[in-house]
């Protein structure tokens, strides 16, 4: 569960390393975001010569959370950390590579590009 002020790792090669959630999109008083939800983030740590710079405000989709996601069969998939993939204005990933596993829930959320780039889909 991601909320305002949550720090996330970036799971792509856009140039950002750490981002902070500044808003959960999808409702005026929505408090938490889970896997597949879109959030507004600010870049807190970036590598030199990357596509994004420190301080930029971006849109991102949550791909991994410590809280995890519950499946219909009752199983829960949890991860060691929280991670997001940065998006452009057309809701497409900025990076060309995705690092680490992602869940099948992203397939329903119109993020097939992220699922196809990911090395492992759980």
Swiss-Prot record:
InterPro entries: Ribosomal_uL14, Ribosomal_uL14_bac-type, Ribosomal_uL14_CS, Ribosomal_uL14_sf
Pfam families with a match to the protein in the record: Ribosomal_L14
GO MF entry, a single one: large ribosomal subunit rRNA binding
Signal peptide start-end: none
Source domain of life: Bacteria
Keyword Transit peptide: no
GO cellular component, one term: cytosolic large ribosomal subunit
UniProt keywords, alphabetically: Ribonucleoprotein, Ribosomal protein, RNA-binding, rRNA-binding
One GO BP annotation of this record: translation
Cystine bridges: none
Described purpose of this protein according to its UniProt entry: Binds to 23S rRNA. Forms part of two intersubunit bridges in the 70S ribosome.
Subunit description: Part of the 50S ribosomal subunit. Forms a cluster with proteins L3 and L19. In the 70S ribosome, L14 and L19 interact and together make contacts with the 16S rRNA in bridges B5 and B8.
UniProt family annotation: Belongs to the universal ribosomal protein uL14 family.
PANTHER family found in the cross-reference section: 50S/60S RIBOSOMAL PROTEIN L14/L23, LARGE RIBOSOMAL SUBUNIT PROTEIN UL14M
Protein name: Large ribosomal subunit protein uL14
Organism in which the protein naturally occurs: Pseudomonas fluorescens (strain ATCC BAA-477 / NRRL B-23932 / Pf-5)
Species classification: Bacteria, Pseudomonadati, Pseudomonadota, Gammaproteobacteria, Pseudomonadales
Gene giving rise to this polypeptide: rplN
């Amino acid at each position: 569960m991601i909320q305002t002020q949550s720090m996330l790792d970036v799971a792509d090669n856009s140039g950002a390393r750490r981002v902070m959630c500044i808003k959960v999109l999808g409702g005026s008083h929505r408090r938490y975001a889970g896997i597949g939800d879109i959030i507004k983030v600010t870049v807190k740590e970036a590598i030199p010569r990357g596509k994004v710079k420190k301080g930029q405000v971006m849109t991102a989709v949550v791909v991994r959370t410590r809280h995890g996601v519950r499946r219909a069969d009752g199983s829960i998939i949890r991860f060691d950390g929280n991670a997001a993939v940065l998006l452009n204005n057309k809701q497409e990933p900025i990076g060309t590579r995705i690092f680490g596993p992602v869940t099948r829930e992203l397939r329903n959320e119109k993020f097939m590009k992220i699922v196809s780039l990911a090395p492992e889909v759980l």
